């Protein structure tokens, strides 16, 4: 591990020990996490005794599910599941890749991130809670707001919070885990606490997932700052990693290009 990764590990240990942090999160979907990046994240998380959550590329992303199983992901989230049929395809896909025994150590969740999903939510919660269904749902506030034509500045309004609470009540009735994420910051705390008063299992920033009870802690704002610190270090570490790869071949490229120009008498490009 390099110096930056050592700092990241220290943050994760701190979050787990006294801030309610339970998992690190990556995305094959919007974030476009590459497999080598994911391996680095997994190693750091495992050393901190943290779980791994991964948002796959879609409801029927078989390849992503296979890689998730090989890596040993703890939470798998399917994005943009907007209809009962899409949810059934996710359930079919995870049952194809994971045996019932293998599913015992993994939680499968679907995203509630558009108004279309919300309009189908009662039927979808029933499907999700079937014996071979899924374990929970994640309310994604950013895309949900966007699906209503609202900007990020309106994410913390009562309108979005009310939708999240309605979904929370249905998840509670269905005995499913319920997670809220999307632009989570100190400004989000009143909204999250209101949702938590009804039902909430976990909440998440871009890279860190917290137990919902962390909202009752006096150091919750510090927890969110540490989550930002971790994400920033992760991005800096990723940038350095690819800069090193880029520099690896630069000298060889310069030498070969000069040789080409001399031998051919023309520019390569």
Question: Where on the chain are the PLM-derived regions?
Answer:
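Expand to "…catalyze enediolate/carbanion chemistry for C-C bond making/breaking, isomerization
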Residues: 1-269
């Amino acid at each position: 591990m390099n110096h930056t990764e050592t700092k990241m590990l220290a943050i994760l240990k701190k979050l787990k020990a006294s801030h309610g942090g339970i998992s690190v999160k990556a995305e094959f979907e919007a974030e476009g996490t590459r497999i080598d990046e994911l391996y680095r994240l997994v190693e750091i998380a495992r050393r901190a005794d943290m779980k791994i959550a991964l948002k796959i590329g879609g409801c029927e992303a078989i390849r992503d599910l296979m890689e998730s199983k090989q890596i040993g992901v703890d939470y798998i989230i399917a994005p943009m599941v907007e209809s009962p049929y899409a949810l059934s395809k996710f359930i079919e896909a995870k049952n194809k890749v994971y045996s019932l025994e293998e599913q015992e150590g993994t939680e499968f969740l679907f995203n509630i991130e558009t108004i279309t999903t919300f309009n189908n939510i009662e039927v979808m919660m029933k499907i999700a809670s079937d014996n071979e269904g899924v374990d929970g749902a994640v309310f994604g506030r950013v895309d949900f707001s966007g699906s209503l034509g609202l900007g990020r500045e309106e994410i913390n309004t009562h309108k979005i919070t009310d939708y999240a609470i309605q979904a929370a009540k249905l998840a509670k009735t269905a005995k499913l885990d319920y997670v809220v994420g999307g632009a989570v910051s100190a400004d989000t705390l009143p909204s999250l606490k209101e949702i938590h008063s009804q039902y909430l299992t976990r909440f998440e920033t871009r890279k860190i997932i917290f137990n919902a009870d962390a909202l009752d802690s006096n150091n919750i704002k510090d927890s969110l700052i540490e989550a930002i610190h971790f994400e920033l270090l992760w991005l800096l570490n990723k940038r350095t990693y690819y800069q090193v790869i880029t520099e690896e071949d630069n000298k060889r490229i310069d030498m070969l290009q000069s040789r080409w120009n001399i031998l051919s008498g023309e520019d390569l490009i």
